[in-house]
Amino acid sequence: MLASDGKRIRVKEGTPQGGSASPLVANVYLHYVFDLWAQAWRRKRAHGDVIVVRFADDIVLGFQEKADADRFRAELTERMRKFNLELHPEKTRLLEFGPLAIDSREWRGEGKPETFNFLGFTHICVMKRSNGRFTVLRQTIRKRLQAKLNAVKAELKRRMHEPIPEQGKWLQAVVRGHIRYYGVPMNNPALALFRFRVGWLWHRALSRRSQNGRVLWDRMRRLIARWLPLPTVCHPYPLRRMIPTPTTWPTYQTLGWWFSTWLGLWT
């Protein structure tokens, strides 16, 4: 490891926090510690269907059988211990999720299925009003949305005296990048809220620098329409392209089974 004073330090374990190589090294490490082991466990020890999704150190697993989820969690805890790793006690949880979860929890009087956060989205079980079919609603995590708005507010303060076209180009890139990541079906309200709040922050910044008082909203609406992109869906529903469908199962049946699972969330 190269220290800030230029000295080289030999590190026997772990990776330096904040180092450019740390995510790469950690990902390679988890590939052998978790990925290969989880795939082998799914093939040899699972009784029902199992899906595994990992991004860096955030992992979501879906189980058709709750017994599989319980056994996997216990064995994963033991395996992590062998490599001096541990599951996050607050972020590791098991929850019932899917179309059958809605009916079974309602029958037991337990209310709606729990939600979970993954990759910036809150995942929610819902039934569409248009056709009554089950779908997974993905909404921008509120804390992430507010954190981004706080960052925009701070940067606008720094850029307060820049020409409006320069501010507009920067805000355009910010809003477009946000939409390109969070632009999924049924997340339009959160996208529209982000765009509206960015426009409101911009209006406040321009009003503070104006010698004539507040900028009129008629002018501000034209600036917003000129520079801030409208919300749009950039990523269609991933179910058909992401879920492996055995040739002997109809597509609708496959989707029902995959999301009639107990989800174990590990970090």
Per-range role (PLM):
Residues 1-267:
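Non-catalytic terminal/accessory segments
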